[in-house]
Amino acid sequence: MLLSKYFLPVLKEEPSEAQVTSHKLMLRSGMIRQQAAGIYTWLPLGLKVLKNIENIVRLNMNKAGALEVLMPCIQPAHLWMESGRFDNYGKEMLKFQDRHDNTLLFGPTNEDMITDIFRHNIKSYKDLPKNLYHIQWKFRDEIRPRFGVMRGREFLMKDAYSFDINEENAVKTYNQMYKAYINAFRDLGVFVIPVIADNGPIGGNLSHEFHIIAETGESTIYYDKKFKTLKDNPDIDVEEIKSWYAAAEEKYEVNKLPISEQEITSSKGIEVGHIFYIGSKYSVNMNALINDEYGKLTPIEMSSYGIGISRLVAAIIEANCDEKGIIWPSSVAPFKVSLINLNIHDSKCVELAEMAYKELSDKNIEVLYDDTEARPGSKFATHDLIGSPHQIIIGPKKAANNIVELKDRKSGVIEDIEVGSLMSVL
């Protein structure tokens, strides 16, 4: 992509309305623009990151055997009345009437609707297990939306819902999804800690929150140092991990630790995922029954699994930034490479830049080629801000000798590379 053709409205100054780092950087880098309190337009750069995260989450859900569906944003209120949850969300749930005086709502979650779909389409234990997920925009009318997309009113979620014949099988599915979450967050390039949590209004008696470790996190997490091995270990024993100690600050009690205090470390965390074993709460309330192997009508066992896709964008920034801007993990970066031509009027610089641009594009490497008239200092500031993992810098002096600079955004290390060796080094 040529920067001269791209829509990248960067801001030089910090926006006064932004309180947290991710909100400031998303506005400054031209990822989003606010339309109303807690409601944002995603501009091209931000949308690329959102889609990259969405695709990685989708891949891991598919690997876990979940099947993608797409439920509507707008839901009939009678389903929520039937499940007994219509009043649970209070004014956070946006309700309205259509022209026929039917009460509708903008869904904050989908347990009620998925249960309705299940009860009308699955009748026998032979059709189980089933695990359905969707990625859809939701709305919760927060009193004080803040921190940009971290706590907006409109947000993108991945929701999955599993259905099993009994508790034993439901817990097996829960563990499979627990593992899928660990793998998904690793693929996203972030370090997460799963913490035992309350089920809240969702219902049920087994639940885990997943917190990204970030210095600016809202929660303090206390956890076994063994969790640090998850960063590089793809072979996960779920039962072993679930036995490791992890607790949010409100549940941390030094005198009740199952291991020594020396084995515990603490970090700030941002919640980005939550999974629940719900049991039969919705199936009983909504009469979602199936015939078991003995022909007896039995309420289905359900679990629910959520990942905040749009919230993840902000959380990843909080965990991967410095004073200059964002430092994207390669897996979610909008562009893997920023190609910076410091002098677009120098024929040798143009020659090397266009050669590198073609080679990168031919290899399907996402590259943003800065072919603008901006000054070198301005170009460096822009590309440090938007956070491409690698920068290829082409200036007249070194270009004359077929040399370009390759900069690693995270470490700041710059090395001289002969242009013919560029692809092999990358």
UniProtKB/Swiss-Prot annotation:
CC terms in the record's Gene Ontology section: cytosol
Matching PROSITE patterns: AA_TRNA_LIGASE_II
Any one GO MF annotation of this record: proline-tRNA ligase activity
Residues annotated as signal peptide: none
Keywords: Aminoacyl-tRNA synthetase, ATP-binding, Cytoplasm, Ligase, Nucleotide-binding, Protein biosynthesis
Record carries keyword Protease: no
EC number(s) given by UniProt: 6.1.1.15
GO biological process: prolyl-tRNA aminoacylation
InterPro entries hit by this protein: aa-tRNA-synt_IIb, aa-tRNA-synth_II, aa-tRNA-synth_II/BPL/LPL, Anticodon-bd, Anticodon-bd_dom_sf, Pro-tRNA-ligase_IIa, Pro-tRNA-synth_IIa_bac-type, Pro-tRNA_synthetase
Reaction equations catalysed: tRNA(Pro) + L-proline + ATP = L-prolyl-tRNA(Pro) + AMP + diphosphate
Locations listed in the record: Cytoplasm
Pfam families: HGTP_anticodon, tRNA-synt_2b
Superkingdom field: Bacteria
Family, as annotated: Belongs to the class-II aminoacyl-tRNA synthetase family. ProS type 2 subfamily.
Primary role: Catalyzes the attachment of proline to tRNA(Pro) in a two-step reaction: proline is first activated by ATP to form Pro-AMP and then transferred to the acceptor end of tRNA(Pro).
Subunit comment: Homodimer.
Official protein name in the record: Proline--tRNA ligase
Species this protein is from: Rickettsia africae (strain ESF-5)
Designated gene of the protein: proS
